[in-house]
Amino acid sequence: MPELPEVETIVRDIRPAIIGKMISGLVMRPKAQSNLMNVDAQTFYENTMTQIVTTVIRKGKYIIIPLDNDAVIVMHLGMTGKILIKEVPDVSFDERFTSDNFVDRHTHFLMELTDPSGEDEDIELHFNDVRLFGHIWLIPQLDDIENIPIKGLAELGPDALGITIQEFSHIMRTRASIKSVLLDQRKIAGVGNIYADEACFSAGIHPTRKGGSLSKEERVKLWLAVKTVLKEGLKYRGSSVSDYTDASGNAGSFQEHHKVYQKTGQQCVDCDSQIKKIKLSGRSTHFCPSCQSEGE
């Protein structure tokens, strides 16, 4: 599943491409109904066509696209979702769907966007989703962008890049494992399996430890490690360990810099031990048994 660095990379890619452009075409294939969460295709069409994109925002792993009529499009990529920006091919709108050369068979939702001034070329935004676990919502009228009535979005904790040490210390006062706290989007938004494992390794802390067992020094180390690995993930434009690509269809490269994630059986980069894998809260968890302290 795309995590904060992957989603933020996509947001930074699409923001300059679509802000100020008008939605001039919209196609939803039948399978798009699996992605649409709260409205039907007709309602989506009626509330978005001819509207202009005003900005693009990321909250946790959600992508938020407000329009100039106060409607808001919200997207979540799920496990395999992608957002791609493409040039408009020199064929009719309908013809684009007759061949994978123009529209991939896993693209179930497509928006054409036009520059009202005519200065920029028209573009297409493709929502591509192999497994159909991605989500798209439309809020037809929203007065406060900070209060979007979508349950998972409304319950998000502080963003992992912006969380303060005071907030981080507070959420770690728990008997839950550190890994499960890092993955709980209600506690801290944006961290997933990859970056939780990498942050725990960077901080030298065992992922099974209870949050409340951390000393003040360890809390600071883990807080800094979370921010550091996320920023490194952004630097390398995300981790492409499965389906993820940026908005141009290019893979990220942070997977080349992973220290523990999916490194089971390999030698630790800092010692002679082998990386271990266990199941924790239903998720595969990777760590070095020597470098990561289990505490007292």
Where do the PLM segments sit?
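Gly/Gly-Pro- and Ser/Thr-rich, intrinsically disordered tail segments characteristic of DNA damage-repair
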Residues: 1-134
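Generic detection of long, well-ordered alpha-helical segments
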Residues: 1-4, 101, 162, 215-223
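Basic, nucleic-acid-binding surfaces and adjacent catalytic neighborhoods in DNA/RNA-processing proteins
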Residues: 23-44, 57, 167-296
